[in-house]
Each structure stands twice: as structure tokens, then as C-alpha cells.
């Protein structure tokens, strides 16, 4: 479904880098890098420039086997991960792309050690969310199962919520935000989730006020 997207033909010269780099955080995904050699070069250039300027970089590995193989994915994404401040990589993608055979918190820690980055967040479907952080150590966040109306967008919603807290200085709170945002995403059709900060701060299991 991405075969004919115009973005496949983008080049480094096409973009206004001064405008794009006027930001607190640069966020890139493996899906973007996987489309073509052009997009891989654009993503790498973006991260190189952000890293040189001291801008925070976040990478979501988001491996898709229909777009590229694990060897090529690792060749492109590992250098980007090493320049990142926070990396999102599921336990499944850690196994497929980076040969991490462990599970749970250990897998998350091994990814952080491999990349040499401050923070890695790993999801593992219903088994949990794992954090490995240079300052906070390792933590596991249980996943609450719920009825699913429509799944697309839940992963992106989790990352968005987590980055909201991370940019506020608290990645742990960010993961809680991410879980709530992801839960919202599962309750409606479509892959665009709109959640306000006030909704994210509603305590879990709060009763309805009448």
C-alpha cells in the first residue's frame, strides 16, 4: 500500500532542513527508512543533523518484513539507534532485527546496551511494556486487556503518549500516558486518536461523575 506514495522519491535536497530542525525532538521510524534507498538516506541525514545540533532523537524501529529484510533493516537502523536518545523496539523486532534472544526486561536492557543509548522502551503484546533507562533501571508495566474495536493506530498512539511524558521529563509517566492513549485508540475506528492532556491525567478506574 506504500508502493506508489510520492514520498518514496524524496531526496535530501527536497527538504527545508532548517525548518525541520527547529524543534525539540526529531522522531523517525523504520517504516520510513524501509521504503527506498532515498528515504533511508533522508532519515539518516535528518538524524545526523539533529545529533550534531544536540536535538533529542527518538526512533521507532517498527520493522516490517514486507518492506525489507532483517539484515538490511539492521544495517540502516542500528547506526540511527546509536545516535538516538530514546528507542522504541518491540521484543519481537529485537529478535528479528538485532538478534536479541532474551525476553522481558532483559531483552529491553540488552537492546539499550547494544545501542548505547539512555532509554529503550519495548512492547511485548499482552505480556507487558518494558523500560530500560540509564537512570531508572529496568521496569515492567503490565498490560490491561480490553475489547478491541479497531487495532490500527494503537502502536503509534502508544509511542505518542510516551513521548508526551518523556518531553515533560518523566518517561515513566509517559509510558502510562502511552498505555492510556493506546487504549483509547482501540476503542474507535480509524488510526487517528485525539486525546487531551486532561483526559490522559484522569486516574484509572475513575467512576463517572454525575
Positions of PLM-derived features:
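Short, solvent-exposed coil/turn linker segments
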Residues: 9-11, 69, 189-190, 197
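Acidic, glycine-rich active-site loops and adjacent beta-strand->loop/helix elements
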Residues: 4, 63, 145
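Conserved beta-alpha-beta core of the PfkB/ribokinase-like small-molecule kinase fold
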Residues: 25, 31-109, 118, 127-128
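Conserved phosphate-binding/catalytic region of the ribokinase-like
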Residues: 48-49, 100-210
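Structural alpha-helical scaffold elements that stabilize or flank donor/cofactor-binding regions
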Residues: 18-19, 79-80, 113
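Conserved phosphate-binding/catalytic loop of the ribokinase/pfkB sugar-kinase fold
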Residues: 1-40
